[in-house]
A protein has these predicted regions:
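Alpha-helical cap/lid subdomain in secreted, periplasmic
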Residues: 63, 89-227, 474-565, 570-604
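Boundary at the C-terminal end of the N-terminal hydrophobic targeting segment
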Residues: 27-31
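Conserved SGNH/GDSL esterase-like catalytic core that processes O-acyl groups on lipids
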Residues: 33-38, 43-132, 168, 287, ...
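Non-catalytic, glycine-rich low-complexity segments
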Residues: 229-257, 309-317, 324, 589, ...
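Catalytic-domain carbohydrate-binding cleft regions of carbohydrate-active enzymes
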Residues: 274-276, 324, 335-336, 341, ...
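Extended acidic/polar, glycine-enriched regions
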Residues: 252-335
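Bacterial N-terminal signal peptides
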Residues: 16-24
Length: 703
């Protein structure tokens, strides 16, 4: 083979030629780069970051997109979309520069400043036409340009005008923006979602920090490129999972935009396409109860295969420490744990990575909590003595009774967190609109129990983040422990919580209603069954009132049931060890109300009190076979007259009613029962189920 020998002069000539060609190609590439104009206000400009030039969302977007794109930041602080607003964007220099930029892609995020009382009340009717005019301006300047219209970033409750107009006007603007996107045939990009569950990334309740701007940049990057990391599913989808039987099942996941998704299970085959935002969903036909299904999901590039899938009954088990209380800690653990080998019961145990013990958390813990990485899970596990021992005792006993009665697979998801208050489990939008006061300065907020606030401050003690997150913070556990389930189909919920709200019965009544509203909206089921354990007996003065409040809530709210636990309490320990009766009493409610089984769901539930002279006749639901739990006379009944002073009363069973009277009360006006923090009340029905603490007004019927 001939060898080519290059002389030094020839080498220099060739090298120079390569340099010239490379430079020309580089210039050509630069000329052909895709131009992205980021149009907006101070949020686009980068207010809230230390260095907007490098840390604003357009700057971070440039780094993500790389040299094939040229991103321009055309944000101006205080800019309004409204042309008659206090600072119209279309009258600012940035608007002209953005037009001259000749963008191939225009990303518009305007409307936050239009919530100003100088703007929205007077000029709201101009918003849609003004927005359409802005879009037309860019399309005229660059025909064929791609327009991305952005939903507004959050404005938090700490904003000075949040309740006086900003919250509601922002909601109206969001609706208008969706209308604009449809009318203009523009793409709608959600810039609320990446920040909404991360209020610490909005230090002034409005402007994102560098990390928050990074979340916006990644969202816009996905919208521009359609790349979302390929096919993914929520963590709750795993081998050995249980899917809800006999109901249409909607699967939800993520993939790159436009990806063709194919799903197969049990002879069914379905397909759909991922939307522009990377989300996809499809609905399976109802599955019959069974085992050993295989679920396959593919986008053509990656296939997810879930084996050992069962179809059966799925329940979410939630609340605070008495739901988190482990089977190995229960009074009957020695007998029950070795018997817990039940392959048709499957457990999804969402355990906190850091317990809320009386200690300061590490920097790693604080950072993870801020990122909503609070739970850990080993996936779905079949029920064995080992897996059951560390699972919720109440949930285990509930699931065991369901399985024994129904003879179908049972899936239990437990996300309970010790010490957690009800407000931590309600979604942010619900609290913002229905109870915003509880969101402000939560570690100093009297709506929140002093112990809860003190423990949170102790855990967060070493944090330098002024808005450090914590599991007890309002909304946190919904965002970290419910939302990640991505509406995984469940038959219902069992709940054991209230100890951390017993200081304020009235606030809890609001919160409990909002909790049910929140979860039922989330799962799209207005009648989602919700069965809860009443607080037990404990020497805390407010608990009789709280237990009675829980009783009244059950009678007011649809698709609810309450398991009375006052007979299995511990006078000195907020964590009574008798959990088997609690789980089984909750299961009775489910078996009766959800599955139509003919068994008494609960203990005697007072209906009314009628006076005849000194005597009061109390009637009850679930009253068949009224008796006492210990064979002793009825006790803890009290009667009050017009003065409101209660006196001990004698009580006897008459058929399916109880008759009470007190020699000190001539004209009874009210009766109460079990009205001691730690009560030894003993009224039960034929099923051995105890009556709830109650206080009831007396209706006079004559003498």
């Amino acid at each position: 083979m001939a060898t080519l020998i290059l002389l030094p002069e020839m080498k220099r000539t060739i090298l120079f030629s390569f340099i010239v060609i490379a430079a020309l190609l580089s210039g050509h590439a630069a000329a052909e780069s895709v131009r992205v104009a980021c149009v907006g206000n101070s949020i686009t400009y980068g207010v809230g970051t230390e260095n907007p030039v490098a840390e604003s969302y357009p700057a971070q977007l440039q780094a993500l997109l790389g040299p094939a794109y040229e991103v321009g930041n055309f944000g101006h602080s205080g800019a309004t979309l409204l042309r008659r607003g206090h600072r119209p964007y279309m009258s600012l220099p940035e608007f002209g520069r953005a037009l001259r930029f000749g963008a191939d892609i225009v990303v518009i995020h305007l409307g936050v400043n239009d919530t100003d009382p100088r703007d929205w009340p007077d000029f709201r009717d101009d918003f849609i036409p003004d927005y359409l005019a802005l879009i037309d301006s860019f399309r005229q300047a660059r025909p064929g340009c791609r327009v991305l219209v952005c939903r507004l970033t959050p404005i938090g409750p700490r904003h000075a005008r949040f309740e006086s107009g900003t919250r509601d006007w922002r909601d109206s603007i969001q609706q208008c923006i969706a209308t604009v996107a449809r009318a203009a045939q523009a793409e709608l990009v959600d810039l609320e979602a990446p920040l909404y569950a991360y209020p610490h990334l909005l230090p002034d309740a409005l402007h994102p920090s560098r990390e928050g701007a990074g979340r916006l940049a990644r969202t816009v990057y996905g919208a521009i490129t359609g790349r979302y990391g390929g096919l993914r599913m929520p963590a709750v989808y795993a081998d050995s999972m249980v899917l809800q039987r006999d109901s249409a099942i909607t699967l939800r996941g993520w993939a790159d935009a436009g990806a063709r998704i194919r799903v197969s299970i049990g002879g069914q085959r379905h397909h759909t396409q991922a939307a522009r935002n990377g989300c996809w969903q499809l609905t399976l036909r109802p599955l019959k109860a069974g085992r050993d299904y295989t679920l396959r999901i593919t986008d053509g590039q990656r296939t997810l295969t879930y084996r050992g899938v069962a179809a059966g009954e799925v329940w979410l088990c939630s609340g605070q420490s008495n739901m988190a209380f482990r089977l190995r800690q229960a009074a009957t653990a020695a007998a029950d744990v070795p018997q817990a080998r039940q392959p048709d019961i499957r457990l999804f145990n969402m355990q906190p990575r850091w317990e809320t013990t009386a200690a300061a958390w590490s920097a790693e813990a604080l950072d993870s909590v801020n990122a909503l990485r609070y739970y850990d899970s080993a996936g779905w596990q079949t029920c064995t003595p080992r897996s059951a021992a560390d699972f919720s005792a109440v949930a285990y006993y509930f699931g065991q009774m369901l399985h024994d009665s129904l003879q179908v697979p049972v899936g239990l998801i437990c996300n309970a967190v010790g010490g957690s208050p009800a407000e931590a489990w309600v979604d942010r939008r619900t609290l913002e609109h229905e109870f915003p006061a509880i969101l402000r300065l939560w570690t100093q907020n009297d709506f929140i129990q002093p112990w809860v606030r003190a423990r949170a401050r102790q855990n967060m003690g070493t944090s330098a983040q002024p808005l450090q997150r914590h599991p007890y913070e309002p909304c946190y556990l919904f965002e970290a422990g419910v939302a990640p389930l991505e509406r995984f189909p469940v038959r219902g919920v069992i709940w054991y919580q209230g100890e951390s709200n017993a200081h304020n019965m009235e606030a809890h009544e609001r919160l409990f209603r909002l909790l049910l509203q929140s979860w039922r909206q989330y799962w799209g089921n207005d009648s989602l069954p919700f069965f809860y354990a009443q607080l037990s007996s404990l020497n805390r003065p407010s608990w009789p009132w709280f237990r009675d409040s829980q009783r009244r809530l059950m009678t007011d709210l649809p698709a609810c049931g309450m398991a009375v636990t006052s007979d299995v309490g511990d006078s000195l320990d907020v964590h009574p060890r008798q959990k088997r009766p609690v789980g089984r009493r909750l299961a009775r409610w489910a078996l009766n109300r959800v599955y139509g089984r003919a068994l008494t769901p609960g203990g005697p539930l007072v209906k009314q009190a009628e006076a005849r002279g000194r005597k009061v006749r109390l009637s009850f639901d679930y009253a068949e076979g009224l008796t006492t739990s210990d064979g002793q006379p009825l006790r803890t009944f009290e009667v009050a007259g017009p003065d409101g002073v209660f006196y001990p009363a004698q009580a006897v069973v008459r058929h399916d009613a109880v008759v009470v009277e007190s020699p000190q009360v001539e004209s009874p006006c009210s009766v109460r029962y079990g009205w001691q923090p730690f009560t030894r009340a003993n009224l039960v029905n034929a099923a051995g189920l105890p009556a709830s603490t109650f206080r009831v007004a007396v209706r006079a019927t004559g003498r």
